UniProtKB/Swiss-Prot annotation:
CDD domains: ALDH_F18-19_ProA-GPR. Catalyzes the NADPH-dependent reduction of L-glutamate 5-phosphate into L-glutamate 5-semialdehyde and phosphate. The product spontaneously undergoes cyclization to form 1-pyrroline-5-carboxylate. It comes from Saccharophagus degradans (strain 2-40 / ATCC 43961 / DSM 17024). It is found in: Cytoplasm. Gene3D superfamilies: Aldehyde Dehydrogenase, Chain A, domain 1 (3.40.605.10), Aldehyde Dehydrogenase, Chain A, domain 2 (3.40.309.10). Coiled coil: none annotated. It catalyses: L-glutamate 5-semialdehyde + phosphate + NADP(+) = L-glutamyl 5-phosphate + NADPH + H(+). One of its GO terms (biological process) is L-proline biosynthetic process. This is Gamma-glutamyl phosphate reductase. The lineage of its organism: Bacteria, Pseudomonadati, Pseudomonadota, Gammaproteobacteria, Cellvibrionales. Its main location: cytoplasm. Pathway: Amino-acid biosynthesis; L-proline biosynthesis; L-glutamate 5-semialdehyde from L-glutamate: step 2/2. Keywords: Amino-acid biosynthesis, Cytoplasm, NADP, Oxidoreductase, Proline biosynthesis.
Amino acid sequence: MTVQDYMLTLGKQARAASRQMASADTGKKNAALLAIADAINSARDTIAAENARDMEAGRANGLDAALLDRLELTPERIDGMIEGLNQVAALPDPCGEITDLKYRPSGIQLGKKRTPLGVVGIIYESRPNVTVDAASLCLKSGNAAILRGGSEAIHSNKAVAVCIAAGLKAAGLPETAVQVVETTDRAAVGELITMTKYVDVVVPRGGKSLIERISADARVSVIKHLDGICHVYVDKTANLDKAFNIVINSKTHRYGVCNAMETMLVDEAIAADFLPRAAKEFAARGVELRGCEKTVALLTASDIPVVAALEEDWDTEYLAPILSIKLVANMDEAIEHINNHGSHHTDALVSENYTLARKFLTEVDSSSVMINASTRFADGFEYGLGAEIGISTDKIHARGPVGLEGLTSQKWIVFGDGHIRN
């Protein structure tokens, strides 16, 4: 069978399964999630053995330490997969919710009903636990899913797929509601993102090159974010103790995540009081500082290591212990910098001025805008969404962390009693 024929088969099966999933009741969906959790728990040894095969192949193929870390399924990570399934089962089911019900002057009753998207294709790299995260969210939201993991995790993903199929079968749902692509041929991705008849939306999770390629080539809708160039602006009215804790947490809590601060903006009026203190702490934690001309002058005078920032630094997602710092004259300059150089992901203001906070919320064009809080809160779990399928920086129905509701849409529903239009 050719890759094209194989993917076509998956697409047809997913479309058929999606129709059954759309009408599946909450009890059945939750039963499937709990049965998958039980199956994974029972298959721990098999999953670990298959993951060990992937790890061995990864080392032989020269995968770097970061990729190997994401690939590994430790006992704790398997526990996390099981816990994630239990958490999603406990979340409210968004499907079927009817809102905005009202009568029109014509006498008809009009409302909106939340419905699944249909078939969701998810393309991701390295992390086999994403297979479970993606499957659980798609199932609970009434969708069918086609999951294409990285070739480096093929054995792990196949082992997890067996558990997912067993859980679906035990709950009386179609086993084809979640299908893992079992070929490592890259042509499978090209087929998946162009099957407009069978796939409704694609969610890429991975490096920038993967997401750019899918965005350029896809013929189905894409939910994505390319970069997490997140800013924290410390305004002149800020409580400096609050600001210190927020910027340190935003940058150093975890470096390799999309909601970590990459650029810190500081009002010139408080720079002398605030910047050396914060910079000294960053330096003590091993963070390389790259500053504008004024930043370099101020920190050099305080004997704090700093290098001159290049223009491209303002447009870089480091995912590393590196921080760009720029002094600005006022909030207008800060907002202009964020909107010109940011990635519409997450940006924060530290300020005690209510009027300025309102201005920041209104004018910063990002999927999450925060006042006096760390950018690290931009996360599906922290937002009460449970697991997330990803974070969208596009201006579509799903913006910011995409949980269950982001995998649904709304259709108009109309009730009449023989009404006709005059």
